Every structure is written in structure tokens, then in C-alpha cells.
Amino acid sequence: MNKISVLQVGNEDLSLQLHIPDFVEWNYINDLRLAKERGYDVCVLNRCVNEKEARILLKKIRAYTLFLLDDVNVDQWTTWICTSRRAKVLDIRTLQEFVNDDIQLFFSYTYGEKYDPHSLSISQNFKGSVFWDGFNGVELEGDYGDDFYQVAYWRGNIPVFQGQTINFWLEYEKDDSVSIQLKIEQFQSGSLSSLQNRWIFTEEDLSSNVYVTNNNMDGPVFVSLLAKGKGKLKIVGLHDRHSRKSYGEFLPGGVRMVSSKREEVFMYFDPGDMKPPLNVYFSGYKTQEGFEGFNMMRKMGAPFLLVAESRLEGGAFYLGDDEYEKFITTGIQDCLNQLGFDRSQLILSGLSMGTFGALYNGCKLQPHAIIIGKPLASLGDIAVNERISRPGGFPTSLDVLVKNCGDMSQKSIDSLNHHFWDLFDQTDWSQTKFIVSYMLEDDYDMTAYNRLISHIDDVGVEIIGKGIHGRHNDDTYSIVAWFKTQFDETLKLDFKRGDLDEE
């Protein structure tokens, strides 16, 4: 188990009164000027802090990792840092219990993944029809019998270490006449016969995340799907994530929203110094699940919101039904409301797939600025380019087309393109500036930048662009460097903020 670094600030060293597990590194510091580590996983505060100390804590600890003991009578700056870091009040009488049971959930890394659909096998005993639909899932139809039996299983077991908790989330669709269960079995490492844990989850259990905690030896888990009844069953995807239980998704404080179609979107809000603007960053395509851009956005010092999703392979461009898309716009607006900001104090940003999230939701929110790198706008054209311009380069684009339009016809290609551009053309951009870096020979969406310019009809809209030679993924370093520089300039010039925090 990785070490958990704890910073305790107070007039006395509480570790002398506690039993500290081997995996906890307890750092008692009363003078915060002596806090040399770049950051800590958890902070326990049992005295008030002044302004200088509050500013140090802002740099040293992440939001949602500050715990204020309940016997502290808070003052102005203690209240300020507790608000910024989204502190929780902890009963001093339960501190030992917290150290024993919960502090291990504040590990510094994040990890999540979707089982590769190629690792999904259908049971040989199933005699019905099977239709494979890329990363959109596999559709089964037939008679599964009167009792639960294995209809599918995932090859490639994942390790679960002693004391570790793993979340599982199953995306599926089915007829009411079909019932399912998820079975997870754990074996001892190096053995396929020594079964040490078995969990069976019902449909009611599967309405939310299910998790397994390994209190035995290290060992891999094998996952299978059981079914009974008769009808259609679509297995969309199975996700496994290192769990923080009630403390958040991926990061402490991470929020997970799920639509009635079992589609997820994730958000992480850090209030920063609680001064404008609110910087929103949409994660790009990635197969390892979780939030992107945390360190980059945090160094800016301002409030920020990370948005991520894990549908298909690496993401589905934040497109969905009204319920799903409303999660995103409502989530952003809620953060603005918490801060007391309006949309003139909002910046939407992203790279590659994240640019579509920024542009698409920008149509609905009309922010102060949209800062993007490697823009992708015409999703239908991106799918078309998979055939000739970029064979095998981004097959997810084909899944996105089928997911939203049902097939890969020219009519569907045009429809997916128009879905974005029609909304873009109806938007009042008069109060928004666009800052865009793009690849001159982009093989994903080669017309995105020029079309953005040609579709902005509002007089006086500021557009700053920089073209870099290469295909879509040829020079990400230069794109990101310019992206950061322009973000810095926007914060300085438009919001009178200082240099980025280089801490």
C-alpha cells in the first residue's frame, strides 16, 4: 500500500495520542513555514490559522482533504481556508477510527479503466443471437433459461491487493423479461483453484456502483455476467476503479452523475482562492479513466472545474440526450452560483476531444472566453476521415457516429455535423472571445478553425489563433505550451490576476 502523507497543524502532536498505521506518514508541523513537502494527501487542523498560513495551506493541500477538529473555534482566515478547501469537521473522539479506516482512501493517484470489449466472451452455452457493435456494446437475444447461469465473462483478470477496495460499474440495457446478476470471484495470486472471495450483485445492487474490498491475500478477480429469462440484453461496458468510497470519484470530492440510460459524467470542483474567473477544463480522449488537467488548472490559483466522461473508448465527446447534457451545464452553473460569479466570469477550455465539450457547452453558456487546442467540431467529418485520411487512427469516431445517429450513412454524417453547427450559428457570441491553437495539417477535423471563423457573425468578436504544422497528434507539446501561455495572459489582462503559481 502506498504511503499516505498527513500534515497535522496544531499546538500539540496528536500522533503521540494515536496509533499510526505503517502506511501513514504523519507530519506534525506547527510553523507552516517549515512545511517543505510539495503537497500532502490529508491535513488535520486543530488550531486557527492566520492569512499567511491559510495561503500556504491553499498551495499545500487539495480541496476535500482538510479535516478540522470540532474543538476549534474558527476565526476569519480559518473559515476562509475551510471554505476554499471544502473542509469537513471531524469529531476528535473519532480521529483514531478515521486514521484506521478512512485515511487510506486518500491515496495520491487516481486509477480507472474500462474492460476492453475484445476481452468479453459469450458463453458457449448461449444459443441465441449475438451482434457486436464496436465499443457501443454487444447485443444478445434469446432464451437464457429459468435459472441464473453465466452468459458472458471478461478475460484478463485484474489484481486486487490486500486492503484495497475496487468499484465496478456495469453499463447495460435489457428487456424487463430478462434478469441479470454480476458475479465477481477472487483467487489467491498464482492459483486458479484457491477461491478466497465471491461476490454476487443483483440488479438492485447494480443501480449504483458496487464495490469489493479485499480483506484477504492479494489476488486477481474474475468477472462474469449471469442472466435468466428471455429477450434482449445489451452489454455496453464494465468499468473498474480504485475506490475512495464516500469520499469521491477518482479524486477526493469528485462527483459522479448517472443518467437513466446509465451513462456517466464526472466533475471535480476546486474553489481555489474564490476570485474570478471559474476555469472549466474538459478532459480529452483517454483510455485510463479519471480527470485530466488537475495540476495545470490548480497552478493557476483560480477556481476550476474539471469535467470528464468514460463512455465508448476514451469518451464520447460529451454528447448525449437532454438529461445527460443538462448534467454538464447545470453543474457548471451550480459552481458559478456557489462562487457568486456570472457567465462573464467563466472560461471554458479543453484540448482535442475536450474542445468539443468547451465549444458545445459554450453555445449554451456564452462564457467570457473559450480557450482550446486542436479543435474538433464536425464529428461526422472526423468519422469520414477514418477511411482515407486517417485509416485506423481514431476508430472511436465511428462509434460516436453510430451511437448518435444509428449508422454510418452520409445522411447521418451530415446530421452529426449539423447538430453542432446549427447550435453554434444560433448563439450570440458578442461577449465571448475565442483563443484557438490548431494543427495546419490536422487529419481529424481539418476545417475546424476556418469554419469557426466563418461561422462567427457577431461584429467585434475577438479571435486569437495560432497554427502549428503537423497532423492532429504530431506536436501536442507546442499546442499545450501555447494553451497555457494564452490562459495566463487572459487571467492577467481580463481578470487582473498575477503570474501562475509556480509552487
Give names to the regions the model predicted.
Residues G340-S352, F356:
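Alpha/beta-hydrolase fold nucleophile elbow
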Residues G10-I56, K261-D270, S415-F420:
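A short, well-structured beta->alpha microelement
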Residues G301-G314:
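Conserved alpha/beta-hydrolase
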Residues C363-C405:
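Hydrolase active-site cap/lid region
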Residues Y109-G253:
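Beta-strand-enriched, solvent-exposed domains that form extended recognition/catalytic surfaces
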Residues Y318-F341:
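Alpha/beta-hydrolase active-site loop
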Residues K275-Y285:
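Short beta-strand element of the alpha/beta-hydrolase
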Residues P391-G465, G470-D499:
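The feature captures the conserved acid-bearing segment of alpha/beta-hydrolase catalytic domains
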